[in-house]
Each structure stands twice: as C-alpha cells, then as structure tokens.
Amino acid sequence: MDKGRERMAAAAAAAAAAAAAQCRSPRCAAERRGFRRELDSWRHRLMHCVGFESILEGLYGPRLRRDLSLFEDCEPEELTDWSMDEKCSFCNLQREAVSDCIPSLDSSQSTPTEELSSQGQSHTDKIECQAESYLNALFRKKDLPQNCDPNIPLVAQELMKKMIRQFAIEYISKSGKIQENRNGSIGASLVCKSIQMNQADNCLQDEQEGPLDLTVTRTQEQTAQQGDGVLDLSTKKTSIKSEESSISDPSSENAVAGRLHRNREDYVERSAEFADGLLSKALKDIQSGALDINKAGILYGIPQKTLLLHLEALPAGKPASFKNKTRDFNDSYSYNESKETCAVLQKVALWARAQTERTEKSKLNLLETSEFKFPTASSYLHQLTLQKMVTQFKEKNESLQYETSNPPVQLKIPQLRVNSVSKSQADGSGLLDVMYQVSKTSSVLEGSALQKLKNILPKQNKLDCSGPVTHSSVDSYFLHGDLSPLCLNSKNGTVDGTSENTEDGLDRKDNKQPRKKRGRYRQYDHEIMEEAIAMVMSGKMSVSKAQGIYGVPHSTLEYKVKERSGTLKTPPKKKLRLPDTGLYMTDSGTGSCRNSSKPV
C-alpha cells in the first residue's frame, strides 16, 4: 500500500511539473490561445451584462457610485438637428438690378420713357431696400457700422462705406440680370441699361473721391480700341465678326462690305510700303554678294522676275514700278493667301537678317585675339579664306624669326613650374585653337570643299620639332582639319606630331591620320618627371607629395617608380635588337624569348 501511494504521489508531482512546464507542441499552443481568447471574451461579456458601474461598486464600495452621481445634472441637453429657416434674409433674397439713384428725365421725352422711369424708380426703391437687408445679413447687424476705429481718418471711413455699398449694389445687379435673361423681360432690360449708363455717369463724377472702377466702362474702351487700333491682318477674327454681324442684323451687310473694302485698300497700300523696304534690302544683299537671287526671293518674299527687273533697271537709273507687280501678284493669288504669305515671309526675312548679323559679329569677336582680319562674307565662303590665313600666318612667323629672343630659363625648384614655351609658340598654339574653333562653327563647310582644300595644300605629316611653328605644321593641321589643336602638343618649345623618319613610314601613313593624344595626363615635362621619380625612389617624398609639388600625374609617376624598382606585377615587354642580325628579340619578363623578323 505504501508503494502504491508513493507511485501516485510521484505521478501527481510529474503531472504538476508537466503543467508548470508548458508543452511546446503546436497543438497545445493553439489550444492555450483558444482558452485565452475565450476568457477575454467572457471578461468583455461580463462588463457588458453587469455594467461597469456595478463592477466598480463591487470593487471600490458604494462611495464611488455616490461620487459619480454628482455629475448627472452636467450632461448637455439633446438638441434637434439644425435646419435652415423658411425665410432667410440672406439666402432667399430677391435680387434685381440696382443703381444709386435714377435722375429725373427731361420733359421732352415721350410718354413710354416716362412710364419706364416711374417703373425704374419703384425698382430702385426695392433694390435699395434689398441692398440694405443684404448688408445687414452680411454684417449680422441692423445697421451699417457707424462708429469705426478712431485711428482711421474720416476720408478713409467714407471711402470704405462707399466701396461696401457699391459692392452690394453690383452683386445684386448682376444676379438680377441673370434672372431677367431667364424670364425674358424686355422692359426690365431697358431699365437696366439706363441704370448702367447712370452708374457710369456717377462713377465719372466720383473719380476723384473713390477708387477707379474699370468694370463699367469696359465696353466703351473696347470700342475705342477697335476704332484707333492697328490694322489686324489675321483672317479669323474678321471672318467671325462678319458672320456674327450678318446673322444678327442682315441690314448691316453693306456697311461690313464697305469696311472690308477700305481695309483691303489700306492693306494694299501698307503691303506696297513694306514691299518697297524689303525690295531695297534684297537688292543690297544681292549686290553685296551675301545672297543670290533665289535665296533673296525666298527670304524676302519677292518674285525672282521682279528682282531681275530691278537689277537690270538699277544701272540704267530707271527704277521699275513695283506697284504694278504687286497688283499682278495679288491678282494671281487670293487675298487671304497673299496676306498670310507676306506676313510670314516678312518675319522670316527679319529673322534671317538678324541671324546673319549675329554670326558675323561672333566671327569677328572670335578672331580679334589672333590679330587677323577675317572677311565678313557668308559662311559658305569659309574654305576660300583658309589659304589666305595660312599665308598671313607664315609671314607673321617669318617676321618673328628675325627677332632675337632668348627662351626663359626653366627653374627646377619644388612648388614652382615655369612655362618653357616661347612667345611665338604660344601665339601659334592660340592661333591654331582659334582657327579650329572657327572651322568647327562654320556649318557650310562640306566634304567636297574640304577635299579640294586638301588637294591644294601640300601633304606633310611630319612637323618640325626644333624650332617654332612653321608653315608645314599649319599645312598639316589644315590637311587634317577634323582634328583638334590638342593633337599638336606643345612641349619644350616644339610642336610634336607623328614622328616617322624614314620614307617607308611616310608612305605607309600617307592615308592615315595621326593618333590623338589620350588626355592631359601625357602633357608633362619629362625632366620634372625624372626629378620627381628620383625624389620618390630616394625615399624623400611619397608619390602623392611629389605629385602635388612637381605637378606630374599620380598614376604615371607611380607606374614609373614601380617599373624602375622592379615591383610591377606584369612588367612591360622589352625590345632588344641583336647587333649582328636584323632580328628583334621580345622579352616578356617571364624568361621566354621569341624572335621576329619584322620590327614592331
């Protein structure tokens, strides 16, 4: 029995331990979550059924319930939803046309006008009352604010009151116009027109006191502008206006036809004046050689026959009549087409003239630095002037050679670099840059003209490397006109080109252009580079410090230092020529040799 009790106690202890340590299986975890969710729901249901006050009373006693009863009278009363009043002075306001006052009409007017004036007086009284009620509803007061801020002057107060009243009157008058148009009442519209005229008179009288109002006199300004304005050559507005006038009033067709006839006569006179001015400009351009007859006719909109006639009449001293030609031109084409074409061609001619003047000015400004006189001709004559520029450049260099000028001494001091290029060389390189930019900006230089220029100039690919810029260097530059002057690298007072000393090399590279330099990292002084390499290899400077002091490229300096110290991962191939044979031996640095009978 004792053993059985011990076993049961051990099982109970194991069950308690198992209950204390939660099972990690997903099934047990799901069941536990379900139990927790159900307990939470029971808690909410208990609070909903029993009531929160009862739970608080059971927890804290009846004193809390008694304290909460003090706030029962403080709850707001229930209010009905807001609804708009049946008759609101602001929402349901009868709006009609209004004015400040209608003056008494003259006795000479007829009886219908007197009846209309009496109706207008009654309308005016109603509208004034409506304006007052509108202002009262707007400001939520019975009367307008009489007592304003004492700091505001009296003149400003009166002006503000007048502006507020004018705003109310105009607002009601505009809404009244809309209602009258919907109802179709003709008599009321006449009253509105008379009221608007009276408002215009009142505004003209009160110009000095009140602010300027442009809304009333806008129609009068439009009619004045139409009468005194410049003639409009567009066909859309005139056609639309003529159609509207013919539809609205058929009796005004004769007046419209007469107006169009006068406009057409005015157009013919103006077009003749414009044509005379354009004709004189076209003849000047043709005589100066800037344009030929075909281009001048297209740009200025003048027939070629007319230009030929005037060119023939100029030497004889008898100017041809251009008005007859314009009449024939207007007869051959319709009125609308000739008008639009003339306007477009006039704009095109003015634009082309401005463009040519702008290009000529830019060319002159570009060549002022090189002390050359570039001809002020059209851009398509550019290839004919290159030869003249070459000759002038040659004469200038010959005159500079007679001047004895010692080249400046190059100081090899750290942090100080002196340019070793002579004055003539600097002028030559700047000139080549200018000529290159001019050749690139000229858009009419075609391939055929360039080929002719290459045939004229001598074909020399080798440049002189011992003196200043010579004629052969300029010729070879123009021979390869599509290259930048950066290809002619300035170094140590010389101009470097593709160096081939033998005739075989020249024959092989007759049809090839020189290789372009790879960038500014090759433009350095070799002596300064040698000094920088020596400083780095001796350990006195690092590569970065030597680059900053001597101004040499960092990558080139580092490569040359590693090459001379033998620390390159892939050393360059060495070319060694055997003394006895004409063979070249290539050593790749790995111990393998290879012979080749052809030099690389």
UniProtKB/Swiss-Prot annotation:
Residues 103-124, 239-260, 494-521, 564-600 are annotated as: Disordered. The keyword Transcription applies. It is found in: Nucleus. Residues 105-122, 587-600 have a biased composition (Polar residues). There is a cross-link at residues 241, 318, 339, 396 (Glycyl lysine isopeptide (Lys-Gly) (interchain with G-Cter in SUMO2)). GO terms for molecular function: DNA binding. GO terms for biological process: regulation of transcription by RNA polymerase II; transcription by RNA polymerase II. PANTHER family: LIGAND-DEPENDENT NUCLEAR RECEPTOR COREPRESSOR-LIKE PROTEIN, TRANSCRIPTION FACTOR MLR1/2. Its main location: nucleus. Residues 543-563 bind DNA. Keywords: Activator, DNA-binding, Isopeptide bond, Nucleus, Transcription, Transcription regulation, Ubl conjugation. May act as transcription activator that binds DNA elements with the sequence 5'-CCCTATCGATCGATCTCTACCT-3'. May play a role in spermatogenesis. The keyword Lipid biosynthesis does not apply. The gene is Lcorl. This is Ligand-dependent nuclear receptor corepressor-like protein. Expressed predominantly in the spermatocytes of the testis. Also found in the kidney, liver and heart. Residues 515-567 form the HTH psq-type domain. InterPro entries: Homeodomain-like_sf, HTH_Psq. GO terms for cellular component: nucleus.
